[in-house]
Amino acid sequence: MSELYDITIVGGGPVGLFAAFYAHLRQAKVKIIDSLPQLGGQPAILYPEKKILDVPGFTNLTGEELTQRLIEQLETFQTEICLNETVLDIVKGEEGFTITTSKAKHQTKTIIIAMGGGAFKPRALELDDAESYSNLHYHVSNINQYAGKKVVVLGGGDSAVDWALAFEKIAETSLVHRRDNFRALEHSVEELKASSVEIKTPFVPSRLVGENGKITHLEISQVKGEESQLLPLDHLFVNYGFKSSVGNLKNWGLELNRHKILVNSKQETSVPGIYAAGDCCSYEGKIDLIATGLGEAPTAVNNAINHIYPDQKVQPKHSTSL
């Protein structure tokens, strides 16, 4: 039988990493299981160079920097980390739970699920032959390689606006959105309007023009009208959000609300001993932000500790007095 852990955290993104660190502060024996080949979740994989604006105390923190800081913080302690393992099933037993993954079985007294939105895949640009062009992108790995280029960004949410503002500093940038209004943070929208980014609204992409495997022009059409324009470009970035899949979550016996795990004020799920934090969980008034998830993590940990050791207080000493 495998070693028994106090808390096993399913998910190695920002919330999972901080939950693991905080659990060590409570003297818990901790394990992290993640389906990805590296820690960090979406910030590390999808937007390592994007600025993250909702982490208190930082104004120019990138996804990669956030990940590295959280990993360095966690390295203060010894943590069992299992990567490239997909959780298939969770079964309750006498001492806690058995987690069956694609590689092994894990024994744990409690579980904290911090898997974000689950498996994620960008929403594709649905135009003919879009997937065949090498200069059509869904994420940015090294922004400096686009310096001096003509860049067109598609989308109207936070990611699209933030990337347009980032590209504007080094490239000739256009932003195409189907509406005159943007879904991004108001501050970012005001910054966009004051920038040199060429804003094309309300337009949608209608045709790709290319040669030798690269897009040379994007045709855009007015949403309610007959006007069309042809935009020259070197690179096209699609920011239509992501399709997420919770995979086997529906088979774990947890009460769900629209593919998210219902939790109470203790971050406890419908199964005693299993907790959830971050974007994967749902409760009335929930706001999906990294900052929110980082706050939920200690609540989940403290209640997990209390579940294991009922004589220990849910509210420990404050970290400043440890």
Curated annotation (Swiss-Prot):
One of its GO terms (molecular function) is ferredoxin-NADP+ reductase activity. Keywords: FAD, Flavoprotein, NADP, Oxidoreductase. FAD binds at residues 34, 42, 47, 87, 120, 279, 320. It is an enzyme of class 1 (oxidoreductase). It catalyses: 2 reduced [2Fe-2S]-[ferredoxin] + NADP(+) + H(+) = 2 oxidized [2Fe-2S]-[ferredoxin] + NADPH. Its cofactor is FAD. Its EC number is 1.18.1.2. InterPro entries: FAD/NAD-bd_sf, FAD/NAD-binding_dom, Fd--NADP_Rdtase_type_2, Ferredoxin-NADP_redctase_2. Gene3D superfamilies: FAD/NAD(P)-binding domain. It comes from the Bacteria. Binds 1 FAD per subunit. Coiled coil: none annotated. Homodimer. PANTHER family: THIOREDOXIN REDUCTASE 1-RELATED-RELATED. Belongs to the ferredoxin--NADP reductase type 2 family. This is Ferredoxin--NADP reductase. It comes from Streptococcus gordonii (strain Challis / ATCC 35105 / BCRC 15272 / CH1 / DL1 / V288).
